[in-house]
Amino acid sequence: MHRRVIEALMKSKQRLWAWLFVLLAIGGGVTPACAQNAPIRSTFVKLGQGVPGVLYEPTVPGGKAQIGVFVMHSGGDYLTHSACTELSHRGFRVLCANNSSAKSGFTDDGTLDRTLLDARLGVAYLRQYPGVRKVVLLGHSGGGTLMSAYQDMAENGVKVCQGPEKIVKCPDTLAGMPPADGLMLVDSNWGLAAMMLFSLDPAVIGESGGQHLNPQLDVFNPSNGFNPAGSHYSADFIHRFQTAEGRRNNQLIQAALARLAVISSGGGLYRDDEPLIIPGGNFRGGNNRLFSQDVELMSHTRQAWPLLHADGSSVTQIIHTVRVPENDTSHSASLEQGALTTTVRNFLSTFAIRVTDDFSYDQDSVHGIDWSSTYSSPPGNVEGISVPLLTMGMTGHWEYLAAETIYEHARSADKTLAFVEGATHGYTTCMRCEKTPGQFGNTVKTTYDYVDGWLSRKGRFLD
């Protein structure tokens, strides 16, 4: 059977099991086997219109149940994310919720402004829940954008997202959000806007469609160094690709700002917004390009940090990725898989970030991004956050390197950075990355044991 058909069947099966879990949770509670086995109960919670949640909590609450962890992603279905059960089995109360955006992935209707209001519902729910004294946000992947933007605005007010440095200002409706007591960014990426930038195909000719590509800028052209078993691009190609990518990014922003001015003056196609389709602009993982094919890019940290091993030990060292090449197929010609289907306003507030002429990235650094030009940027957002911060990276995936960037920008006096050896972006063990079977052990357990220790450290959130 064709590999894509098999993958589609597996994804359908995973979604079926996820929703069966939620239905069981609503009906009476589920306690699957986890790294820790304290029994839990789960309760469906309607936080708002189109904003479902499931509260996971120990059946016999202990001291750690005073901490309520709130989990929400920028667009994905997180009602059964591993944090829901792994942390509740370790004694914490965990509210896992979905925002009100569509979960099909075809259109990107989940504007950051709206999902921030959805997140406010979750924080408010935990704030009034009996027995919860502290609320800690957990952002994974694109959830790092949502949770860091939320906490920055909640601590500092909307003035932090209405300054002249922002591409567009946030609305006043985001004022007055209740702040959390802590923030965990566990394999957050660089932000929705930066991931759109990193996924933008500079080979696309024109902006009317994705079927015509410039072969000299195509990462999937073998003449440029592409190899499905592992690509190696020349320094010249990398420079040309990144320069063209940054140029197209800024051109898209300028064009969208021009359309916004027309819309605001009453001359748009609609009075409130306009549809916008960007060919080769889909930001999801299968479209992340260049560094996903060439593992020498974004391959190690600049400084030494704790690396967590399967046996519970840690070593402070330069952190190298163990990932393998991914993304061997171009989706630029596909509307559903390769294009960003959004609106002018949503693009500018959620997916746009400015870059300078020297935009680039190499083995250990990203250069030339104005992290403060948008509130869709964890590195920019953490500059205003004062509560305790935990940031972690999974070395079996490229997004792990964002953890160092976020940590270096963080204002928090109490901030922690650690990396999990051999974990995928979803915290599971990267078996394809192992040189010997079992080399990395149970990385889910390694990850959540560390999170548990950070949350329950005396004096941080617990007396």
Where do the language-model regions lie?
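Short beta-strand/loop motif that positions the catalytic acidic residue
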Residues: I385, T391-G393
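N-terminal cap/lid segment of alpha/beta-hydrolase-fold proteins
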Residues: Q36-K64, T436-G441
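Alpha/beta-hydrolase
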Residues: V219-G380
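Conserved alpha/beta-hydrolase
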Residues: S88-F106
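Short beta-strand element of the alpha/beta-hydrolase
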Residues: K64-S74
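Alpha/beta-hydrolase active-site loop
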Residues: D109-P130, T145, A149, Q162
